[in-house]
Amino acid sequence: MSVLTSFRKRFIEMREDIILMLNGEIERIPPVKSDLTLMNWLRNNKNLTGTKEGCAEGDCGACTVVIGKYDYTSKGVGWHAVNSCILFLPMLDGCSIRTVEGLASHAGELHPVQNAFVENHASQCGFCTPGFVMSLYAGWCQSRNLDNAAIDDLFAGNLCRCTGYRPIKQAASHINNILFEERDTDYRDEEEKFIVENLEREELSIKVKHLDHQIRFDAPRCLQSFQEILHTHNPLILAGGTDIGLWVTKKHMELFHFLYLGNVKELNQFEENEEGFLIGAAITHEVAMQKMADHFKSLQELWRRFGSEQVRAIGTVVG
């Protein structure tokens, strides 16, 4: 046993169960195969079938859900629309997830975002509707001013095969008329409390047997732990999964050991100094765009055309 491995076993607490919040309820999930996607877990394990599979590659937006995740650069919780078809479930440890089924009140009263779609007749065949609703809900959570350009950005990652975009955009404009101070945040307060408290939990380290192989997923919280795993094993480094997710969903590759860097505090730092910018390996395109746009005006339009909001929310600049 190496000195580093001995240190890890003695001083770094680890666990194998995934802990997350789903539609306001805490879920404790026993070890799962590391490449189980969030979408498949929602549909097959939780029977939340509003989340649809359209393309299985993060392009169509039918699988869109909203996640709350801690942002080390802002030192708060950020809310993002993401493609659940290419996100692996263990990546969501410590996060809060909202699906379309979780928007209405317990009494069955529709969320204002859902009402906007109803009142503006913004659904035709309905297959894409949950994804559009969740993208608009992400804009609601972010308290964004939804002018025409912002609406286009918000829905850039959602496709409607019926081409019913006009009433969909009208629904978004309708939401913009609701004052920010009138938008409910009470239940999100509980979600944010859960996310922050999770930062103090043990590191996630999942090991399961599959086809005579051990499948492993490590999600260290500190750089020392990350380096130890990297140097003592031969893991595949996983950041946002916007490429690796397709290796699983499209190429059907069997991947045996993920080393996830999304929880490593030191790799989630963005610093500006006299020499330029120091961009951590876990910094997403969305965060980098917010930090650098004022310095590089010409990059603003380029970044808007890079992927979609769902992709920029998880895809990393460093790769």
What role is predicted for each listed range?
Residues 2-224, 265-267, 273-278, 283-284, ...:
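Signature of N-terminal electron-transfer/Fe-S-associated modules in redox systems
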Residues 233, 244-249, 256, 263-268, ...:
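Acidic, glycine-rich loop-and-beta core segments that form the ion-binding/anion-interacting portion
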Residues 218-219, 236-240, 260-261, 279-281, ...:
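General beta-strand structural signal in soluble alpha/beta enzymes
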Residues 53-56, 235-245:
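Aspartyl protease active-site motif detector
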Residues 66, 155, 239, 244-246, ...:
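A gly/ser-rich beta-alpha-beta helix-loop segment of oxidoreductase catalytic cores
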Residues 66-70, 81-82, 247-261:
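Glycine-rich loop at the start of a catalytic domain that most often binds anionic cofactors/ligands
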